[in-house]
Amino acid sequence: MSDNDELQQIAHLRREYTRGGLRRNDLPAEPLTLFERWLGQACDARLADPTAMVVATVDENGQPYQRIVLLKHYDEKGMVFYTNLGSRKAHHLENNPRISLLFPWHMLERQVMVTGKAERLSTLEVVKYFHSRPRDSQIGAWVSKQSSRISARGILESKFLELKQKFQQGEVPLPSFWGGFRVNIEQMEFWQGGEHRLHDRFLYQRENNAWKIDRLAP
């Protein structure tokens, strides 16, 4: 198959979105109410990793980067995730706290985009979550100097076994280089696929401690 033939095949990959629409009268006043409903439906549908979200940050040169991270908590204060504080995303957020999150629930023909500013979590919040993780995951947090270059996977595996022996007694301590961020939500956009590419999009935007809701063209 030539490169041109392959491109033609990709160009024709499409499907109709038929699962249903989203109407203004169906929207709650608070975006997290709708998010909770949609997340619950994603869980009920047994989607793989329904809390997985694409996290977008920007470096000092304006170059955007994305990666998939798991949402670990949300409430009226914002959305929370955890990471190695030496990671690329953590360094980006230290210099520029602007951030975007995307929940791609393809099977439900939905996506939710969140934009706002990220702030570091308190040590108390981080410790509480860290010790709720499986013990091997706690040890794994010690192993990796995230985003640094390594020559082989065996380095990680050897370090894991070494630390598992070291921490076999008692509680695994919280690494000083491990923490979390809370995304203070400024906007949330809900997208529902529609027939003939006439998708439904609604934008919640915070204004004066209230939420303004607008329908956007698809």
UniProtKB/Swiss-Prot annotation:
Substrate binds at R14, R15, E16, Y17, K72, Y129, R133, S137, R197, L198, H199. InterPro entries: Pyridox_Oxase, Pyridox_Oxase_CS, Pyridox_Oxase_N, Pyridoxamine_oxidase_dimer_C, Split_barrel_FMN-bd. It comes from the Bacteria. Transmembrane segments: none annotated. NCBIfam families: pdxH, PRK05679.1. HAMAP family: PdxH. This is Pyridoxine/pyridoxamine 5'-phosphate oxidase. It comes from Citrobacter koseri (strain ATCC BAA-895 / CDC 4225-83 / SGSC4696).
